[in-house]
C-alpha cells in the first residue's frame, strides 16, 4: 500500500475520532437574557472560571452565558431582570448577595441581588454544592456594580 494512502487514511481516522470525541461534550444550548449585550455582562463573561465545583467549563451558544459539567450541572446567564424586594431567602457569599429560589428543587435558581445587570445561576444540587459553586463564581460576578444589598427582617424593624 502506498505511503500516501496510509497517511491519508491515518489522518482521516484521526480527524473522525477527534470530532466524535469532541462531540460528546458539545455546545450547551442556552438563551441570552434580555440585557445580555450590557457591557457589564462582558466583564463577567471574560472572568468566568475554567472550573466550578470541579466541573469543567463548557461552550454555550448564547451571549453572556456559561455552563459547567457534562451533563451541564451549572448554568449562568448575565443580563436577567434585576430583582426587586422579595420574600425569598437571600444569602451573602463573599460580598455577593444571592436570592435563592428552591421551588424547582433539586434545581436551585440563584439571582444576584443589588447588582446591575443581574446574574442568574441554576444549579443541580444533586451534582454539585450550591455554596461551592457560588464561591467559585463570586470573583467574576463581583465586578458588577453594587447598587444595594440584602437586608434581614431585623434590619427593617430596628428602633
Residue ranges and their predicted role:
Residues 80-87:
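Short, charged/polar surface micro-motifs in flexible loops or helix N-caps
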Amino acid at each position: 500500500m502506498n505511503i500516501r494512502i496510509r497517511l491519508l487514511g491515518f489522518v482521516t481516522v484521526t480527524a473522525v475520532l477527534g470530532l466524535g470525541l469532541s462531540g460528546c461534550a458539545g455546545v450547551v444550548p442556552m438563551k441570552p437574557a434580555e440585557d445580555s449585550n450590557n457591557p457589564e455582562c462582558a466583564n463577567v463573561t471574560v472572568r468566568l472560571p475554567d472550573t466550578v465545583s470541579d466541573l469543567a467549563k463548557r461552550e454555550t451558544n448564547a451571549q453572556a452565558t456559561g455552563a459547567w459539567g457534562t451533563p451541564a450541572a451549572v448554568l449562568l446567564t448575565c443580563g436577567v431582570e434585576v430583582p426587586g424586594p422579595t420574600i425569598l431567602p437571600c444569602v451573602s457569599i463573599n460580598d455577593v448577595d444571592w436570592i435563592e429560589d428552591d421551588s424547582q428543587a433539586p434545581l436551585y435558581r440563584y439571582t444576584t441581588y443589588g447588582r446591575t445587570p443581574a446574574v442568574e445561576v441554576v444549579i443541580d444540587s444533586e451534582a454539585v454544592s450550591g455554596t461551592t459553586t457560588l464561591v467559585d463564581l463570586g470573583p467574576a460576578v463581583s465586578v458588577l456594580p453594587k447598587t444595594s444589598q440584602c437586608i434581614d427582617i431585623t434590619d427593617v424593624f430596628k428602633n
